[in-house]
Amino acid sequence: MNIENEVHIENASESKREPKPPEGLLEDDTIYITTPYGKISLDGGRIQVKDSDGEIVASFPLEKVCTMNVFGSASVSTPLLKHCSDKEVVINYFTNFGKYFGSFVPSRNTIALVRRHQAGITKEKSLAICREIIHAKLQNSCVFLARKRVEVPSLLKELRDRSLHAVSVDSLRGIEGEAASIYFPMLSSSLPDEWRSDKRTRRPPRDELNALLSLTYTMVNTEVISALRQYNLDPFIGVMHVDRHGKPALALDLLEEFRPVFCDAFVARLINKRMITKDDFTQGSRLNDTAFKKYLGFYHDFMEESLKHPRFKYSVSRKKAIQIQAIIFRKAICGELKGYYPFIYAR
């Protein structure tokens, strides 16, 4: 079976949109409403979206919608809310920047089914997913280093290959930890001398490189959380990271495959192109206010840039690539796919 058909991702022609964000998008059984101050209402058998001037900007067939994701200041009419309650349609609310802040959840809803699958995932399936995630992370780490013309250590390649045969999640954690201790010095060596660091430090990061990495991991993790919420997955029920109060374990799991080719690549760009310099930091290795605003602009542009999806071979933004992984994960745990297919570069 063709995974692209199973996942119902947009095809190449559909991805060629105008530069401005779409007013509305129907994908699989989920719709996205991004119209500023939009009015979302019922019109016969369709969900209708009007802009602030009363013009219709989007329309969706009611029977195909299970989840509505509303961004920014758009409002939902009471008749539509009643319909959503009757038909078990979940509405998720996000800020303009994609930060989740709440949901309308009918007493009977699709969230329960997805969460049941999440909570009931077997150890065997969980291990299989973890293998794919860590293998993808280590392969993507090798790809990142190769793109930076850094010789990839043979032990890193060996650990990558061993990850597919790990017999437990604990052994995978050990493989990932050993690989990280090899990878970070190689990442550091690809940067200008004044930026290099001898080890990864957190809470707090002890130098400017670690500060940029920590900030970027946090930013991309927020994207992952938002994507999981959009597909009614609980970001706090993970397969590899330990469940702890306040820790989005599943988001941290899915973040792993994006760390090298999204997070580390972005930080390397900022440094190598002198978009951010050491003068932009305070004494505590934090970006000053002006530099942080610059950083946010650079980050937004980076996440909206198009790349060729390594599996589907058509252009998507990095933000979209993260959403695709949320779809694939949901379908994998619900039995709609044979397994989890990570975001992984062949070379």
Curated annotation (Swiss-Prot):
It comes from the Archaea. InterPro entries: Cas1, CRISPR-assoc_Cas1, CRISPR-assoc_Cas1_C, CRISPR-assoc_Cas1_cyanobact, CRISPR-assoc_Cas1_N. One of its GO terms (biological process) is defense response to virus. One of its GO terms (molecular function) is DNA binding. Its EC number is 3.1.-.-. Keywords: Antiviral defense, DNA-binding, Endonuclease, Hydrolase, Magnesium, Manganese, Metal-binding, Nuclease. Homodimer, forms a heterotetramer with a Cas2 homodimer. Belongs to the CRISPR-associated endonuclease Cas1 family. Mn(2+) binds at residues 176, 241, 256. Residues 1-25 are annotated as: Disordered. Residues 1-21 have a biased composition (Basic and acidic residues). NCBIfam families: cas1, cas1_CYANO. The gene is cas1-4. This is CRISPR-associated endonuclease Cas1 4.
